[in-house]
Amino acid sequence: MGFRDICYRKHHKKLKQFQKVEIKVKMDCEGCERRVRKSVEGMKGVSKVTVDPKQSKLTVEGFVQPSKVVHRVMHRTGKKAELWPYVPYEVVPHPYAPGAYDKKAPPGYVRNALADPLVAPLARASSFEVKYTSAFSDDNPNACTIM
C-alpha cells in the first residue's frame, strides 16, 4: 500500500446481501396499506413487497439494509415503524422473561425478549436488598432482636 493508494483511495461500498426485512407498521385502512407499499416499492434493490394488514406487517425482500427500509417507511408515510419484534412461540426458551407476553402480538407469536432492549431482563436482587432481607430473618443469629 503506497502513497498513491492512500491519496486516491476510493470508498468501496460493502456489497449488500439479499435478505428479508420484516417491519411492524400500524395500518388501519386500505389507503394506509397502499401508502406503505408504495413507500418502499421504489427503493433501489427491492425485489418483492408483501403487506399483511391483519398483523400490521410489511415484508420487503431484496438487496436492502433494514435500517434504511425502516427510515424510508417512517419518512414517507409519517407512521411509526420498527423491525418485527416478534418470534414464533416455539422459538423462545423457557422460562419466558417478563414482558415477553405482549397483548398486541399476533396469535402464535411472542415478543423476542432476547433481542429487545426495551423488555426488562429477569429481576435480580441487589446486594443491599439481600442484606436488608437477611437482617430481619429468623434464621440469622445476628438479626435484629427488637422485632
Curated annotation (Swiss-Prot):
PANTHER family cross-referenced by the UniProt entry: COPPER TRANSPORT PROTEIN ATOX1-RELATED, HEAVY METAL-ASSOCIATED ISOPRENYLATED PLANT PROTEIN 27
Propeptide: 145-147
PROSITE patterns, sorted: HMA_2
GO molecular-function term, one example from the UniProt record: metal ion binding
Transmembrane segments: none
Pfam families referenced in this protein's UniProt entry, alphabetically: HMA
Keyword set includes Magnesium: no
Organism: Arabidopsis thaliana (Mouse-ear cress)
HMA domain segment(s): 18-82
Protein known as: Heavy metal-associated isoprenylated plant protein 27
Residues that hold a metal cation according to the record: 29, 32
Gene: HIPP27
Subunit description: Interacts with UBP16. Interacts with ZHD11/HB29.
Keywords: Cadmium, Lipoprotein, Membrane, Metal-binding, Methylation, Prenylation
Gene Ontology annotations for the cellular component aspect, listed alphabetically: plasma membrane
Function, in words: Heavy-metal-binding protein. Binds cadmium. May be involved in cadmium transport and play a role in cadmium detoxification.
Location in the cell: Membrane
Similarity section: Belongs to the HIPP family.
Modified sites of kind Cysteine methyl ester: 144
Lipidation (S-farnesyl cysteine): 144
